A protein has these predicted regions:
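Glycine-rich, proline-tolerant flexible connector loops at the mouths of alpha/beta enzymes
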Residues: 127-146, 289-300, 395-404
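Hydrophobic faces of well-ordered beta-strands that scaffold small-molecule active sites
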Residues: 87-91, 128-130, 158-160, 188-192, ...
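Polybasic, low-complexity intrinsically disordered segments
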Residues: 3-26, 30-58
Length: 424
């Protein structure tokens, strides 16, 4: 599911398949002949559409065979526009005992998340972001993970994409976020939103949170967000008891406080309208491979329009600081035979936009970028939303393990990112 989805029901994509920006974890092996692992099995590809029958490998080979090259050979990479300021990874944190998974338990997912962030920092990657999902075999409580990463690193940004605010106690979250930010030295970039379709029906109510009379789930998420943002600015939120507060009689803020955190809150927006709302309130924009509206134009153009409207609304609001904008993409360079083994099928299945239905509304899903590094650089340079953003988040197939994903990020950093104007 793309960050910032603001729908209600589970999305249904082409041919009735679920349509998230990242697919679910591996299916359990049920016997018979093992299938060849695919990128979609490991939580990476942009769509869920999976064709039955033989793959058209000849067509794929014509496009990507030349990309299989020895490490260190950047032949074919050419500078094609751009000025990307930051590149990070976005892990959906899938774990499970399915066939081929190298992330079989929750402990594996957490510990590998730490190690991947350490490796990414060594590669020069700018950010380590994690998806938050409840009632699923994914990351559900991000602050312990982010704090552990902060303690092992010194430069890389740490963040979420996104936290479902329906589930959050705003004041407790403010305490945890400030603590993680202080441990990191001010590197926390916190993506929040209304949340996504989920396995549980009314899951937030099981956590003790239900909409007030006349509220929708989205209204509740925004109410929690307002209380959270107020708390992290140091505003008083609880009446002092003079007997135990040193004689204080006013309102007490939560502690600790981390200066500057309020400017590093991002809203995951699924529509152009919500992006404008986020800009008016002074939150950064986090956009993904899914928008819960469709105007008939290619996904990247619709997303670029969302970004433009966000920036215009930000300027009109007169905020003092410059906002940040991120987009997420599935980028899978084919550099060696191992990459070819995992990603060949994705080049055929996921290399185009798709349209699905979420909560009765038409939604548009972005494509995956799979193939030769020079081809990916050219395609990303033509992606108007990527060019409009300052931060690119790369979804990773986390169940393929730390070593593979570190190699994938290294290939992007070496062969693709420089052509977008990014540098370490």
């Amino acid at each position: 599911m793309g960050v910032g989805l603001e729908g209600g029901d589970e999305p249904v994509g082409p041919k009735g398949n679920h349509a998230e920006s990242c697919p679910p974890p591996l299916l359990p092996f049920t016997g018979g002949l093992p299938h060849k692992p695919r990128a979609t099995d490991f939580g990476c590809s942009g769509q869920h559409e999976q064709h039955n029958g033989l793959e058209n490998t000849d067509r794929f080979t014509r496009n990507t065979h030349a990309a299989i090259m020895p490490a260190g050979n950047a032949a074919g990479c050419r500078t094609v526009g751009g000025g990307m300021e930051r590149i990070g990874f976005l892990s959906f944190g899938h774990w499970g005992p399915g066939q081929g998974s190298r992330t079989r338990t929750a402990a594996d997912a957490l510990l590998q998340g730490i190690e991947l962030a350490v490796a990414a920092e060594e590669l020069g990657v700018d950010g380590a972001f994690f998806r938050v999902h409840h009632f699923a075999r994914q990351q559900a409580s991000p602050f312990p993970l982010l704090s552990a990463i902060a303690a092992r690193t010194s430069r890389i940004e740490i963040g979420t994409g996104v936290i479902d605010m329906r589930y959050e106690n705003p004041l407790y979250m403010a305490e945890e976020a400030a603590a993680a930010d202080l441990i990191s030295g001010g590197r926390l970039q916190l993506g929040i939103s209304r949340g996504s379709p989920e396995p549980a029906r009314e899951g937030a109510s099981a956590f003790g949170y239900s909409p007030q009379p006349g509220e929708t789930d989205a209204d509740m998420a925004r109410r929690h967000t307002a209380a959270f943002r107020q708390a992290i600015t140091g505003a008083g939120v609880a009446q002092a008891d003079p007997r135990y507060a040193g004689g204080a009689t006013g309102l007490l803020p939560v502690q600790p406080q981390s200066p500057g955190l309020a400017e590093r809150i991002w809203w995951g927006a699924g529509t152009r309208k919500t992006a404008v709302w986020a800009a008016e309130l002074g939150m950064n924009l986090m956009s993904s491979t899914l928008l819960t509206e469709d105007t008939g134009v290619p996904f990247h153009e619709l997303q670029a329009e969302q970004i433009q409207r966000f920036r215009e609304a930000w300027a009109a609001a007169g905020h003092a600081h410059v906002p940040r904008v991120s987009v997420s993409r599935s980028v899978l360079p084919i550099v060696d035979e191992e990459d070819n083994y995992y990603f060949a099928g994705s080049a055929l299945r996921d290399g185009r936009d798709q349209v699905g239905v979420i909560d009765g509304l038409t939604a548009r899903f972005g494509k995956s970028y799979v193939g030769a590094p020079d081809l990916l650089a050219e395609q990303l340079a033509a992606d108007t939303a990527v060019q409009a953003a300052d931060t690119l988040l790369l979804t990773v197939p986390n169940q393929l393990g730390v070593d593979f994903n570190a190699k994938l990020l290294g290939n992007i950093v070496q062969f693709v990112a420089p052509a977008l104007g990014w540098s370490r």
